[in-house]
Amino acid sequence: DLITFGSPLTHAEFLLARSKNDLEARQKDRELATCPPIGEVLDEWQLEHARAIGLLEEGQASLSAFPDRQVKDGWTLHHGAAFAVVRWTNVHDHAKFIFCGDLISGPLSPAFGQGIEDRDLAKIDKQSASFTHTRYWSADQSRERLTTFRNAINVLDED
């Protein structure tokens, strides 16, 4: 599990790249990882092999892995698949105006992929009345927010 609270990665198009197009190009080139990973279009022999061992369904042509020649029927995730085996939960507090909520954070799934579960505290509880970027763990959180934090962390992996 990866849990981010108040992550500035919502602004990745200027924190990690020169523009939204540059960010997308870097992700496509696997310089920056996405969740789920961007698949690699496989060669015909790789496609046949992947389908034969059940890794791909008919019609699919890409995979986030490549054949591992040292292991029979083994495949290895490519370097851009860092989040392939990760459950990513992003908790943020939607900002209204400058000082209500967390202007620094925001949803991550639009920039990094639909494998990220974004949890907006303003929708779970109510709009914050003050700046909250450094207050996620303050003792005066509402019951709804504390429950959201506990469920995101879910150390015992309970449903």
Task: Give, region by region, the residue ranges found by the protein language model.
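Lipid deacylating catalytic domains
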Residues: 1-159
